UniProtKB/Swiss-Prot annotation:
PANTHER family, per database record: GOLGIN SUBFAMILY A MEMBER 5, GOLGIN-84
Subcellular location: Golgi apparatus membrane
Transmembrane segments: 665-684
Biased composition (Basic and acidic residues): 78-89, 114-132, 211-222, 248-265
Low complexity bias spans: 29-43, 94-113, 162-180
ATP-binding listed as a keyword: no
Region (Disordered): 24-132, 144-195, 211-265
GO biological process, one term: Golgi organization
Protein name: Golgin-84
Length: 709
């Protein structure tokens, strides 16, 4: 923009210089005689009217026809000197990217100004051709001016007038062409600028002449005005189809050729009268200069703003270029890093793939091991299920047998009780009968004595058998204790499946032994009951025999009878003690069975834990179970000691009751001892109370005396 504005300023300065020169020349020419007459005055009047109306915009069709006519005339005329003037052409904008936008901008055109002939001719012909083409909304101006004069004075006047008249148009051309002038064409030569100003003045005069001609031809050819208006609208907005414009131009070439010739003839007449219009041109030049100066100031201000914008844009461009370089460096660095990351990722992926393959292989091996362990576990589980079923069956059978035995024992005990009650009633009845038969019993004393001796011997045997049974019961108790100790040891120590099976078999054998001992005790009890029945029968017979004896014998028999009843009661107590011991043994047996079940459950749990551990750690050794803590062991030993103490107390109480039952003197002495102890304790309590009642007030008085000063 700055270069364009500089070019515009240079053009305006040249215009000012030429205007001053023209003014001086006009003042000189006015003193010289005017060759032209009334025709020049008429042309001057017409030119004044045209200047007031302003320049006329020609249609593209007229321009085409004029160019054709001009070419014909050029071919007829002799060769002339041509001065080519480069006009300002706006360069396409930087932001445009399409072909239409670049095509829409006006191009630089050259105007050929034909110089004057050195020989000079009788007549000068002036030929003005104005081409204004519309290339997709863009205006391309090609102006070619040919001037031929016969007289040197007329030629100079025409050039001066044309230069003064076209100063306004040169300003417009500078305005339109200034924004797009490239930097290479910023400083043209002074001679070219002068030629350009002269051509611009000629163009303005010719435009005014063309406007007059166009006004005359408006009525004849209204289509030309319509085409001019359409051309203006086309210049403001781009046309979509360039082919349609070319067709219109070709159509209008023929119609406008004739009109162009007429207009050119009128323009020649007007140019002859240009000299007379110098004074009006001076005023117009003054106005043009004022407008140009104002526009120059505006252009300068705009130039400053545009320079500032240009500086800013350059700074932005430099910053953008630096940023682009930085971005390119970053891009290169990122590409290098990306390549490094890709190589690292490839290495990592290869390593990961190798690890995954190794893991897959190990997973397959572990799956195979897991399948084998599952098969083993299924087989072991089937074995365990079979063992559990067998165990449950044996347990149910044992429990059912024990229940049946208990039911039979209870039935027998009830029967014995019923029989005992019946015997008691029978004994009472028999006592009454014995009183009646006491006399008869005296005769059978010898028999009774013999029977008594035999019964005493049998009683001794029975006592011996009872002692043996007690020993057996003690041995059974010891065995049960040993079984409990074994169970505890089994709880403390981890046992394997083979040891557990052996222990289960041993426990089953011990249970069978206990059952056999219980059965033997029951058989012995039944034998004792049979012997008691026999003795009862014998006693009944003896009572029958004793009825025949005397009273003394009856008394002796009563004593013997009482002794036998005592023995019977003693045997009954023994039976009851045996039944209680049997119940205790059954309770212990149930306890041992429960402990056995608990041991089995713990063994199964330990097996499951071992299997789960062996599934994950096949190479690890089986760890031994840790023993119970110290306080648990102390509690277990304390429980054993308490059980032993309770058993000792029970056995002592049983023996004491037996002793007191057998010895009534001991019972009486125990009674007297208890009474004496109670009385002695009561006496002691009474004495202590009296002593406390006596010592209380004396102690209180002593304390009161001690408090005094």
């Amino acid at each position: 923009m700055a270069s364009w504005l500089k070019v515009a300023e240079d053009l305006l300065e040249v215009v000012d210089r030429r205007a001053k020169i023209v003014a001086t020349e006009l003042s000189d020419e006015q003193s010289s005689p005017q060759p032209s007459g009334s025709s020049s005055q008429e042309g001057q009047a017409k030119k004044g009217k045209l200047r007031e109306k302003g320049p006329l915009k020609l249609a593209t069709g007229d321009a085409g026809s004029r160019t054709a006519a001009q070419k014909e005339r050029k071919s007829r005329q002799p060769p002339r000197e041509r001065i080519k003037i480069e006009k300002i052409r706006p360069s396409p904008p930087v932001d445009s990217s399409s072909v239409d936008a670049s095509a829409s901008k006006p191009d630089v055109s050259s105007s050929d100004v034909k110089g004057l002939d050195d020989d000079g001719g009788a007549e000068k012909e002036e030929k003005v051709v104005v081409d204004r083409k519309n290339d997709i909304g863009a205006e391309v101006v090609d102006t070619e001016v040919e001037v031929q004069s016969t007289e040197r004075s007329a030629e100079d006047a025409a050039i001066v007038v044309d230069g003064a008249a076209d100063s306004g148009n040169s300003e417009g051309a500078a305005e339109s062409s200034a924004p797009s002038v490239p930097d290479e064409r910023c400083e043209p030569s002074i001679s070219n600028q002068d030629a350009e100003i002269v051509s611009a003045v000629n163009l303005e005069e010719k435009d005014s002449a063309m406007e007059v001609i166009h006004e005359k031809n408006i009525k004849e050819v209204p289509d030309t005005q319509v085409s001019g208006k359409s051309q203006d609208s086309k210049r403001e907005g781009l046309s979509d189809s360039p082919e349609s414009t070319e067709n219109q131009q070709e159509h209008k070439l023929d119609s406008g050729s004739v009109k162009d010739q007429d207009q050119l003839e009128e323009a020649r007449g007007l140019l002859k009268n240009v000299v007379k219009t110098g004074q009006s041109k001076e005023a117009r030049l003054a106005r043009v200069c004022a407008g140009l100066s104002s526009r120059l100031q505006e252009y300068k201000s705009e130039n400053a703003q545009l320079e500032e914008l240009l500086v800013q844009e350059r700074e932005k461009c430099s910053s953008y270029e630096a940023h682009m370089k930085q971005l390119q460096q970053e891009l290169s660095m990122s590409r290098v890093e990306g390549s490094r990351a890709e190589s690292n990722m490839v290495d990592a992926l290869t390593a990961k793939n190798a690890e995954i393959e190794s893991l897959v292989k190990s997973l397959d091996s572990w799956k195979k091991k897991a399948a084998a362990s599952e098969e083993k576990l299924a087989a072991l589980q089937e074995d365990m299920d079979g063992l559990k079923r067998n165990r449950e069956l044996t347990e149910t059978r044992v429990i059912q047998a024990l229940r049946e035995e208990l039911a039979t024992v209870e039935r027998r005990a009830e029967e014995e009780r019923i029989a005992h009650n019946a015997t008691k009633m029978a004994a009472v009845e028999r006592e009454v009968e014995l009183e009646h038969r006491a006399v008869e019993a005296s005769n059978a004393l010898a028999r009774i004595q013999r029977a008594a001796d035999q019964s005493s011997s049998r009683a001794m045997e029975l006592e011996h058998k009872v002692a043996v049974l007690e020993v057996e019961c003690a041995s059974l108790q010891q065995e049960l204790q040993e079984m409990e100790a074994r169970n505890r040891r089994a709880q403390k120590k981890p046992s394997e499946e083979a040891n557990q099976v052996i222990q289960m078999q041993a426990w089953q054998e011990e249970v069978e032994r206990a059952r056999q001992s219980q059965r033997e005790a029951e058989t012995k009890i039944s034998s004792l009951e049979a012997e008691l029945q026999k003795m009862r029968v014998e006693m009944a017979g003896m009572k029958r025999d004793a009825e025949h004896y005397s009273r003394q014998e009856h008394v002796e028999l009563e004593k013997r009878y009482r002794e036998l009843t005592d023995l019977l009661y003693h045997k009954q107590t023994q039976l009851e003690s045996m039944a209680s011991e049997k119940a205790a043994l059954e309770f212990q047996l149930e306890k041992s069975i429960k402990q056995f079940h608990e041991v089995q459950m713990e063994a199964e749990r330990s097996r499951v834990a071992r299997r789960s551990a062996s599934a994950w750690e096949e190479d690890a050794d089986i760890k031994a179970l840790e023993p119970l803590p110290l306080h648990h062991r102390h509690m277990a030993t304390a429980n054993q000691q308490l059980q032993k103490a309770a058993k000792l107390l029970d056995s002592g109480a049983v023996r004491a009751t037996r002793f007191l039952w057998r010895h009534p003197v001991a019972r009486v002495s125990l009674l007297f001892y208890l009474v004496f102890v109670h009385l002695f304790l009561m006496y002691l309590m009474h004495r202590l109370q009296d002593f406390a009642s006596r010592e209380g007030p004396t102690a209180m008085g002593g304390l009161a005396n001690s408090d005094l000063p």
